[in-house]
Regions:
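Acidic interhelical loop/turn segments
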Residues: 113-132
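Alpha-helical transition-metal enzyme core signature, strongest for iron centers
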Residues: 11-25, 44-59, 101-108, 131-142
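Alpha-helical bundle segments that constitute or directly flank the non-heme di-iron/ferroxidase center
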Residues: 1-32, 94-118
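Carboxylate-rich helix-loop segments that flank metal/cofactor sites and access channels
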Residues: 60-94
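Short loop-to-helix capping motifs
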Residues: 33-35, 121-122
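Short, charged, intrinsically disordered terminal tails
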Residues: 147-149
Length: 149
């Protein structure tokens, strides 16, 4: 599904994306030897779990049979599902975990951009705004969580 045709398909891709990120952070938190990295990764699991629930809640409100179709756009890149320069494959340090969490993910941005530009329908624009706001809030929460006052 590299070229989603409906709003529901975008939500399915977002559900898969957040589920994969949650699983990655959970695995890394379990393997972490750096205590601060483990705490951060556990917090990231909570944030991704929240994102996953928000997306699933939006999906429950839509009937996939009565889909809102997207305007045509470029095919989404499947190869970019995580930051290319991320160091979270093994046992990341706190700084590597933080960089991973804050690194902009190209696929997520593509999905949200496609949703934002797909329709003039207020309900779709509202959905796109809610999902974009959620990602911005997550970024602020990560930044606040890691502040050293």
């Amino acid at each position: 599904m590299s070229n989603p045709r409906t709003v529901y398909e975008i939500l399915q891709l977002l559900e898969k994306y957040h589920g994969q990120r949650r699983a990655t952070y959970s695995r890394l938190a379990g393997d972490a030897t750096d205590a601060m990295a483990q705490i951060l990764l556990e917090h990231l699991v909570v944030l991704e779990d929240h994102s996953l629930k928000v997306v699933q809640g939006e999906m429950q409100q839509l009937d996939p049979k009565h889909a809102t179709y997207l305007t045509s756009g470029p095919v989404l890149s499947q190869e970019v599902t995580h930051a290319g320069d991320c160091h979270c494959a093994g046992d990341p340090t706190f700084q590597e975990s933080l960089a991973c969490a804050l690194e902009s993910d190209h696929l997520l941005d593509q999905l949200l951009h496609r949703l934002e530009g797909c329709s003039a329908a207020p309900s779709v624009l509202g959905l796109a705004k809610r999902l974009r706001d959620l990602e911005e809030t997550k970024g602020r929460q990560i930044a606040n969580f890691t502040r050293m006052d």
